[in-house]
Amino acid sequence: MEKIFQNVEIKPFLIDFSNPFIKNAAKRLFQLEEQLPLVPVNVVMDFKGINRAAVHGLSRVLQDEIPNYMLDIKPGGYKIEDSTDLFMTEQFIRNRINFIPIYAKNETLVFALRSLNNSCEVKTIYSRDLIQVAGPKLKYPIFNPTFEIGFLQPGKSLIIEDIYIKRGIGRKHAAFNLAVKTHFSHLDIEQYPTDKKEYMALSGYKQSSMTSDPRHHRLGLCFPAVPLPHINQAVRTYLKNACRVIIGRIQSIQKIYENFEEPQPELVLFSMDEEKTKAIITIKDETHTIGNLLKTYIYEMIPDISFVGYQCVPHKQEMVLTIIHKASQEDLITLLEKSIQNIIQTFQILEKNVDELIA
């Protein structure tokens, strides 16, 4: 398993200035005569030799389980007494500002929005109207000027101070999503031809991926805000960081059972009878992503296992992994360790392949 990452296609979405209509609209609305500083980038990747749980895990982490940034308003930042357009409520404006796609690395930046409509027409407020009021001078924009934030009626104003950069993950708030539109398919399961779609299952496969064992996959996604001069560098960083996040989360599980002979609240290990051992491992703040990875790799390591399953407990913010197998306690922990090492090795190789494929 030396090369998992087989192929990658990186396609930025660029404005077609050769089209007179688009060119005139860009110039009239935004005074644009060249490409925007940040562009959406579609990425399509082919993987071979790994199970679907690994591809699904990479997909989930890239989308909403990796730290990212969004713009937010600090408490009291929305100046109610100075904002006279009743339709532009704080929650509406906050939501629009949250979802401005940004490329940020510096959390000390602070922006403000001070807009007044002195005209007789409705005024559109764009992200270009945000002004930087604190933090180091930007060498390159962190968001495009074209995102619609709201509207102002004639004679009305909107004043917002303390718009800051907030760090988080997408599963807590969708505005933190690093990637969007993620989807993947299996390339080694026979599909119905196009002219027979009326007879096929909704998946399009002749065999269910639940009963097959696909090892050739295609993953597609979109990064909504990537600096135009550094597209490949940014995509490479995102993919490598996702691999490292998965490796780090898996390695944290190793600490739970490394001293399995000593009592600890996260691990319950006991013999059910003369042959079977049961392990119950509680992992804090973990998700289906890691649960599915563990379950799949343990099954591959121990095909004759009696039982392996997991359950996420949302109100406790934890995941519970249960394993039952005909083995001693020591042997069961050894098999679990080998399964975890296989996961780590998979994503270490994948991280290495990223450097080889994306210059």
Curated annotation (Swiss-Prot):
Coiled-coil blocks: none
Localization: Host cytoplasm; Virion
Stored SUPFAM superfamilies: Insert subdomain of RNA polymerase alpha subunit, RBP11-like subunits of RNA polymerase
Any GO BP annotation: DNA-templated transcription
A single GO molecular function term of this UniProt record: protein dimerization activity
Any Pfam family: RNA_pol_L_2
Main location: host cell
Induction profile: Expressed in the early phase of the viral replicative cycle.
Superkingdom as given in the UniProt entry: Viruses
The keyword Iron is assigned to this record: no
Keywords: DNA-directed RNA polymerase, Early protein, Host cytoplasm, Transcription, Viral transcription, Virion
UniProt GO cellular component terms: DNA-directed RNA polymerase complex; host cell cytoplasm; virion component
Its job: Component of the DNA-directed RNA polymerase (RNAP) that catalyzes the transcription in the cytoplasm of viral DNA into RNA using the four ribonucleoside triphosphates as substrates.
Protein family: In the N-terminal section; belongs to the archaeal RpoD/eukaryotic RPB3 RNA polymerase subunit family.
Name under which the protein is recorded: DNA-directed RNA polymerase RPB3-11 homolog
